From Swiss-Prot:
Listed pathway(s): Carbohydrate biosynthesis; gluconeogenesis; Carbohydrate degradation; glycolysis; D-glyceraldehyde 3-phosphate from glycerone phosphate: step 1/1
Subcellular location: Cytoplasm
Organism: Legionella pneumophila subsp. pneumophila (strain Philadelphia 1 / ATCC 33152 / DSM 7513)
Protein family per UniProt: Belongs to the triosephosphate isomerase family.
E.C. number(s) listed in UniProt: 5.3.1.1
Name the record gives this protein: Triosephosphate isomerase
Annotated function: Involved in the gluconeogenesis. Catalyzes stereospecifically the conversion of dihydroxyacetone phosphate (DHAP) to D-glyceraldehyde-3-phosphate (G3P).
GO molecular function terms noted in the UniProt entry: triose-phosphate isomerase activity
UniProt xrefs under CDD domains: TIM
Alphabetic keyword roster: Cytoplasm, Gluconeogenesis, Glycolysis, Isomerase
Subunit note: Homodimer.
Active site: 95, 166
InterPro entries: Aldolase_TIM (IPR013785), TIM_sf (IPR035990), TrioseP_Isoase_bac/euk (IPR022896), Triosephosphate_isomerase (IPR000652), Triosephosphate_isomerase_AS (IPR020861)
Length: 249
């Protein structure tokens, strides 16, 4: 079901005091009728603590990563059943930093995507192009490859999931795609999914990630195919994050 979502990806930031204070501040500041589903994705070791700090039901917890097996000799990894034990609703898969630093390819990302779905959580599939790929006119080619990699399991694979367009050149750089640039790619993704399953395309939640902040969020969220944001650095500041959430209204 298509819905408005703002998710904060805290990446590898925070220790227990900071994490506890941050989630409490966010929850306190969201003292209004929120039009968006709000999620926070802390470092995995703090997921239980964040879950236990949530009091009002205004925020849900998500995970930044998962390994696509239920159990086994995979030292240091976490499975979807483990994340589900701590009430994770959303799980990032295919984030550009995982692709870049951990060499995760399309097949592995697809395995993660379906592993999350198979266990009743919502995968947030991250797709996006590098600056070089954009300058060489390969944006749509790259994104199509990333999106279609998860479609091998059948026509309903995009049901009950989220796709996040995160242009790699805009992540952590302070650069942001213009609302029109972002809308063009979001529409391209929706049309691409529509070629697989028109109904799922209409109900697909598409969010934008790439230096989203309180100054550009309103213009981005006003675009017809942008349903919210995947927020990085700004989600580590409670006031800034909540200002972004308010831009959904």
């Amino acid at each position: 079901m298509r819905q408005k979502i703002v998710a904060g990806n805290w990446k590898m930031n925070g220790q227990i005091q900071q994490v506890t204070e941050l989630v409490s501040q966010i929850e306190e500041l969201i003292g209004f009728d929120c039009a968006a589903q709000v999620a926070v994705m802390p470092p995995s070791i703090y997921i239980p603590k964040v879950r236990d700090c949530l009091r009002t039901g205004k925020i849900v917890v998500g995970a930044q990563n998962v390994y696509p097996k239920d159990y086994g000799a995979y030292t240091g990894e976490l499975s979807a059943p483990m994340l589900k034990d701590f009430d994770c609703r959303y799980v990032l898969v295919g984030h550009s930093e995982r692709r870049q630093f951990f060499h995760e390819d399309e097949n592995f990302v697809a395995q993660k995507f379906h592993h999350v779905k198979d266990h009743g959580m919502i995968p947030v599939l991250c797709v996006g192009e590098t600056l070089s790929e954009r300058e060489n006119g390969k944006t749509e080619q790259v994104i199509a490859q990333q999106v279609l990699a998860v479609s091998a399991k059948g026509k309903d694979c995009f049901r009950d999931c989220v796709v996040a367009y995160e242009p790699v050149w805009a992540i952590g750089t302070g650069k942001t795609a213009t609302p029109e640039q972002a809308q063009k790619i979001h529409q391209f993704i929706r049309d691409l999914v529509g070629e697989i399953n028109d109904s799922d395309a209409k109900h697909l939640t598409l969010i934008y990630g790439g230096s989203v902040n309180e100054n550009n969020a309103k213009a981005l969220f006003s675009m017809p195919d942008i349903d919210g944001g995947l927020v990085g650095g700004a989600s580590l500041n409670a006031k800034q994050f909540v200002e972004i959430v308010k831009c959904i209204n």
